[in-house]
Amino acid sequence: MKISRQAYADMFGPTVGDKVRLADTELWIEVEKDFTTYGEEVKFGGGKVIRDGMGQGQLLAADVVDTLITNALIIDHWGIVKADVGIKNGRIAAIGKAGNPDIQPDVTIAVGAATEVIAGEGMILTAGGVDTHIHFICPQQIEEALMSGVTTMIGGGTGPATGTNATTVTPGPWHMARMLQASDSFPMNIGFTGKGNVSLPGPLIEQVKAGAIGLKLHEDWGTTPAAIDNCLSVADEYDVQVAIHTDTLNESGFVETTLAAFKNRTIHTYHTEGAGGGHAPDIIKACGSPNVLPSSTNPTRPFTRNTIDEHLDMLMVCHHLDPSIAEDVAFAESRIRRETIAAEDILHDLGAFSMLSSDSQAMGRVGEVIMRTWQTADKMKKQRGPLPQDGPGNDNFRAKRYIAKYTINPAITHGISHEVGSIEVGKWADLVLWRPAFFGVKPTLILKGGAIAASLMGDANASIPTPQPVHYRPMFASFGSSLHATSLTFISQAAFDAGVPETLGLKKQIGVVKGCRTVQKKDLIHNDYLPDIEVDPQTYQVKADGVLLWCEPADVLPMAQRYFLF
């Protein structure tokens, strides 16, 4: 018996050779592989396959998955494939073909009475986003981020303090302890960065031992060559990452001075274009160094006709500047350059900028990391055409390049890729389901550690789950001890060895960062291009390997107003 390709897609979702449009963009992905055995697909529902003696077998709980996502279209850095995904004990247990091995062939994921089912037919499945530029200004950010599809937040802060409004720093052991304790309340993987701006090792070491998973160098605290050198030395000793916001005013040196202070050691450069801060006008040069792991923040993503205007006011507020002081205004204006922002679009498309993050409430929007990543990808396809690596009629490589920017690459950079950042067996089951029409904008379901933490949900008093008003609501994995079992608090190995979780009474699962100091740009997947960057000091024009980088600002973006009418 045969059915039409359209009927098959309607029933089980797209299969090999089918193409799917991502939201209202011009990006199209094509299914590369389908793990199913045609005719043996499993699907739940009345009169469907996953019933006792059919697709569901008789095995005990130990031998079947806890949760099965059926027939989902996976988009990840490693591929665009159709598969069943099995989850066991909060981790991804299998990617393959589900069913009853007693009666079905080629089953790699056993289904039993202990198995819950989530229908993935016609849905896109991605790893939860990893946002590594968080100012922890208010706890409400965490819900905003979760509902956008972000499941890991890394950064610093203590609340709406003036220092936190400007810098991603949780300074000192006392503040670190309070923030670690607070993080127990949220269905989000969280890691904190300490203050890196000091010229002697002691104050840095005590922060790492208190739980910091990294150290942040910020110009507002004084990012001098001495502070950079000291911070990187401590990071090398304790295997934590260093993030840097460089010296916009070039007071203690120019970009060449800062790059020399790195001494070829690994460092994560925040908003490497410079509008978010950094050596004016040429911090963008840093993306050509093999030891530099470059990221963007989302307000400049992508370059539009409104980008310049909104940035000036943003900057004055976030960095405690006074519009009545001429020097403060000049400082702000030096950071906002059309030419370098336009170049940033293209450098992302070339894979020279490797990551994208938010800069939450401090010149960035915490709920728009994923959306702005795909808006940038769409703008670049429209302006630059298909990438050479893309197949005929699809944007698969571009999709893999861009999804890596907010999933696997930030996870690799901060030493947590053994736990999160991709859909791979053994990793924490932080997964996001999307309807293709709403991809990147509004997820349908967010899983944390294999349990549903948030979802679109209709009227709770209705007779079915779907009546309006439909909006995002926290689900059971956001409450009680389930929250502690399904989310991670990341700390340093030194803090783990010192017994910090026990001392502070932390209840969430503990993740330990590792491998931070050996990462090089060549390790950042699909985003490892090392261009030779030149910036004209008069015109701010940017060239990469001798080629001028310029693109027009967008007047209209996809994934925008038509999705936010209410």
From Swiss-Prot:
This is Urease subunit alpha. It comes from Pseudomonas syringae pv. tomato (strain ATCC BAA-871 / DC3000). Ni(2+) 2 binds at K216, H245, H271. Its EC number is 3.5.1.5. Pfam families: Amidohydro_1, Urease_alpha. Ni(2+) 1 binds at H133, H135, K216, D359. It is an enzyme of class 3 (hydrolase). The keyword Metal-binding applies. Binds 2 nickel ions per subunit. Carboxylation allows a single lysine to coordinate two nickel ions. Pathway: Nitrogen metabolism; urea degradation; CO(2) and NH(3) from urea (urease route): step 1/1. Residues 128-566 form the Urease domain. InterPro entries: Amidohydro-rel, Metal-dep_hydrolase_composite, Metal_Hydrolase, Urease_alpha_N_dom, Urease_alpha_subunit, Urease_AS, Urease_asu, Urease_asu_c. The active site is at H319 (proton donor). Its main location: cytoplasm. The modification N6-carboxylysine is found at K216. GO terms for cellular component: cytoplasm. Keywords: Cytoplasm, Hydrolase, Metal-binding, Nickel.
